[in-house]
């Protein structure tokens, strides 16, 4: 029993000695190349990395961000991306409105919401593959 205990203590002592450098200073391991905790950019891989790089360039390749609101006039309509030549659009019309007015938006000239008159325009959108 005592020999088993001494063997365990000896193994722990050897492990502690291996952890220290040649001058008795404890060796440290870091995950990042410069030391410390890596940033999100250093750690991201795959699709997450592609999205982060695109976001740094100001792009939104997977339509994750909310659409940019325009004034909704005929000269400055709200742009609606679509992969086809028509798309169904919902307009809330007023901030405190609890119903959504749905209507079809076709490619070409800007169209108005039948209820409030806000202008929308369909723009072509290429999906990222």
From Swiss-Prot:
A cellular-component GO term for this protein: respiratory chain complex IV
MF annotations from Gene Ontology: cytochrome-c oxidase activity; metal ion binding
GO BP annotation list: mitochondrial electron transport, cytochrome c to oxygen; response to peptide hormone; response to thyroid hormone
Residues recorded as bearing N6-acetyllysine in the entry: 68, 86, 121
Keyword Zinc: yes
UniProt-listed InterPro entries: Cyt_c_oxidase_su5b, Cyt_c_oxidase_su5b_sf
Xref: CDD domains: Cyt_c_Oxidase_Vb (cd00924)
Membrane topology: Peripheral membrane protein
Subcellular location: Mitochondrion inner membrane
Cytoplasm is among the record's keywords: no
SUPFAM superfamilies: Rubredoxin-like
Targeting presequence: 1-31
Binding positions (Zn(2+)): 91, 93, 113, 116
Primary location recorded for the protein, binned into one broad class: mitochondrion
Pfam families per UniProt: COX5B
Keywords: Acetylation, Membrane, Metal-binding, Mitochondrion, Mitochondrion inner membrane, Transit peptide, Zinc
Top-level taxon of origin: Eukaryota
Pathway as given in its UniProt record: Energy metabolism; oxidative phosphorylation
Function: Component of the cytochrome c oxidase, the last enzyme in the mitochondrial electron transport chain which drives oxidative phosphorylation. The respiratory chain contains 3 multisubunit complexes succinate dehydrogenase (complex II, CII), ubiquinol-cytochrome c oxidoreductase (cytochrome b-c1 complex, complex III, CIII) and cytochrome c oxidase (complex IV, CIV), that cooperate to transfer electrons derived from NADH and succinate to molecular oxygen, creating an electrochemical gradient over the inner membrane that drives transmembrane transport and the ATP synthase.
The family this protein is said to belong to: Belongs to the cytochrome c oxidase subunit 5B family.
Subunit structure: Component of the cytochrome c oxidase (complex IV, CIV), a multisubunit enzyme composed of 14 subunits. The complex is composed of a catalytic core of 3 subunits MT-CO1, MT-CO2 and MT-CO3, encoded in the mitochondrial DNA, and 11 supernumerary subunits COX4I, COX5A, COX5B, COX6A, COX6B, COX6C, COX7A, COX7B, COX7C, COX8 and NDUFA4, which are encoded in the nuclear genome.
Protein name from the UniProt record: Cytochrome c oxidase subunit 5B, mitochondrial
Source organism (scientific name): Rattus norvegicus (Rat)
Taxonomy of the source species: Eukaryota, Metazoa, Chordata, Craniata, Vertebrata
Gene for this chain: Cox5b
